[in-house]
Amino acid sequence: MKVAVIDYGMGNLHSVLKSLQAVNENGADIFLTRDPEAVVKADKVVFPGQGAMPDCMRELNRHGLAEAVRETTQSKPFFGICVGAQLLFEHSEEGDTAGLGLFPGKVVRFADDQVAGGERLKVPHMGWNQVYQTRSHPLFAGIADGERFYFVHSYHFAPADAALTLAESDYPQRFACIVGRGNIFATQFHTEKSHRAGLQMMKNFLAWDGNV
């Protein structure tokens, strides 16, 4: 089994690769690539992302990878992480950027005036936060509802279709932090920075056949 981790220069790539390799129990060939053909030929695809969405979209197009992402999401198990997940939506408020349009909806910024417990919440949302599962999914196997994952983001998903939301978190209002449909699964948090729970989710992805 070949698992492509898309390298377009904008992700926490080596940490993602190392985390996947740490839970690779069945000898999968897990590799970084910026070759669109290699992405399309892979059996599974991981799409990390870190930084500003306009920069990520520009680099994705510069390397000719946007169409490869669109093609692989049609049928293969696909895992988007952080900005890699945000890019799946139609539009982001960050830099008024068009996304790949695979999911209906947009990516919006947290309000700067949010208050919880009498204190103003900082943007970006950074640190450990609980994730509440709203739908069952194979990638939740072995992960408790309310488990903590590691977040670093100023923008979050606003899906136009509620059925896309698989899990939510609070900051302080509820927001979608895992979205998915069919063979696509995408997280706002960084699985590669989320210790045991993040590794379990990556392990589940390697075992997943893309069916829900």
Swiss-Prot record:
HAMAP family: HisH. Gene3D superfamilies: 3.40.50.880. One of its GO terms (biological process) is L-histidine biosynthetic process. PANTHER family: IMIDAZOLE GLYCEROL PHOSPHATE SYNTHASE SUBUNIT HISH, IMIDAZOLE GLYCEROL PHOSPHATE SYNTHASE SUBUNIT HISH 1. This is Imidazole glycerol phosphate synthase subunit HisH. Pfam families: GATase (PF00117). InterPro entries: Class_I_gatase-like, GATASE, Imidazole-glycPsynth_HisH. GO terms for cellular component: cytoplasm. It catalyses: 5-[(5-phospho-1-deoxy-D-ribulos-1-ylimino)methylamino]-1-(5-phospho-beta-D-ribosyl)imidazole-4-carboxamide + L-glutamine = D-erythro-1-(imidazol-4-yl)glycerol 3-phosphate + 5-amino-1-(5-phospho-beta-D-ribosyl)imidazole-4-carboxamide + L-glutamate + H(+); L-glutamine + H2O = L-glutamate + NH4(+). GO terms for molecular function: glutaminase activity; imidazoleglycerol-phosphate synthase activity; lyase activity. NCBIfam families: IMP_synth_hisH. The gene is hisH.
